[in-house]
Curated annotation (Swiss-Prot):
This is Protein phosphatase PTC7 homolog fig. Mn(2+) 2 binds at D77, D222. Its EC number is 3.1.3.16. It catalyses: O-phospho-L-seryl-[protein] + H2O = L-seryl-[protein] + phosphate; O-phospho-L-threonyl-[protein] + H2O = L-threonyl-[protein] + phosphate. The lineage of its organism: Eukaryota, Metazoa, Ecdysozoa, Arthropoda, Hexapoda. It comes from Drosophila grimshawi. Keywords: Hydrolase, Magnesium, Manganese, Metal-binding, Protein phosphatase.
Length: 307
């Protein structure tokens, strides 16, 4: 699973994509409030031996953090091919997310540069973690409270959706070298240094998007997106617009994970992964893709300020 690839066009993956909804950044002129995210996390481990670990679902890892200036959510999907070498890539993914979480807690972080979190978190891992090897994708999104703008940095095939009034406002782009080989951050053992695919955090695609009261933000690893089509995700979440009760958001996250897990085990289902495999002339046939699944679901609430 590990190989070197000529990384053509690396620079184009670093472009900043702007997507403002008619400059309605939470309509702060009328709300005059402070935005926050009502968040819920759920997931499922493909390998039950890896279940039950803190901030991990199998080889996936995640974090959420709230600060006065920002709220940040992140997921990382450890690359499973390392198991062939006796390495648990979930440890790498968890350390990467732990580093990013700690950096998001710093007083000067205001949510406007999650890619810098990823850069610094990755370099901390390389420089300070002992015998933490492996690789993972990563997706970070941060809410900049002062103007209710969502900033993102996505590397690989994890990703996020923003929904408004039951429609997809934005979906992140995935980065692949070839089919089923996503961009990934790596720290290999010395013996594998020149045999392992490794991209740079600076290559993460960055976007910024103005949010409004009631918008939904869905951050997930490919265990969700490879098994559930976008239209079904929209269907599952369309009644959640404007929901501010955390228990309702949690139930919706639970349903998404349950759905993805059921579909991943079906052999008669044309999953998004199966369709992409066919489009790439791969002999995958039909069926879902058993995988670790991590979902972070958030609803945007803007509290009213008293005059």
């Amino acid at each position: 699973m590990f190989f070197k690839v000529c990384q053509l066009g690396k620079g184009r993956c670093c472009q900043v994509l702007l997507n403002y909804a008619s400059c309605q950044r939470c309509q702060l002129s009328s709300y005059k409030g402070t935005p926050r995210l009502i968040k819920a996390v759920q997931g499922s481990s493909k390998d039950q031996q890896l279940a039950g670990q803190v901030q991990r679902f199998g080889e996936d890892s995640w974090f959420v953090h709230s600060a006065p200036k920002s709220e940040t959510m992140g997921v990382a999907d450890g690359v499973g091919g390392w198991r062939q070498m006796g390495i648990d890539s979930g440890v790498f993914a968890k350390q990467l997310m732990t580093n990013c979480s700690k950096l998001s807690e710093q007083a000067d972080y205001d949510g406007r540069n999650p890619r810098q979190l990823l850069i610094d978190g990755y370099h901390r891992l390389k420089e300070h973690a002992t015998n933490v090897w492996g690789s993972s994708t990563a997706c970070l999104v941060s809410l900049h409270r002062s103007d209710c703008t969502l900033h993102s940095a996505n590397l690989g095939d994890s990703g996020f959706l923003v929904l408004r009034h039951g429609k997809v406002l934005h979906r992140s782009d995935e980065q692949l070298h070839v089919f089923n080989t996503p961009y990934q951050l790596s720290v290999p053992p010395t013996s594998q240094m020149h045999k392992v695919l490794s991209d740079q955090p600076e290559e993460a695609i960055c976007t910024q998007l103005g949010l409004q009261q009631g918008d939904l933000v869905l951050v997930a690893t490919d265990g969700l997106f490879d098994n559930v089509v976008e239209s079904e995700l929209v269907q599952q979440l369309q009644q959640l617009h404007g929901e501010t009760r955390v228990e309702k958001v949690q139930l919706a996250a639970n349903r998404l994970v349950d759905l993805a897990k059921r579909l991943s085990l079906r052999t008669d289902y044309q999953s998004p992964f199966a369709l992409r495999a066919k489009a790439n002339n791969m002999n995958y046939g039909a069926g879902g893709k058993p995988d670790d699944i991590t979902v972070i679901l958030a609803s945007v609430e803007v509290s009213q300020r008293s005059n």
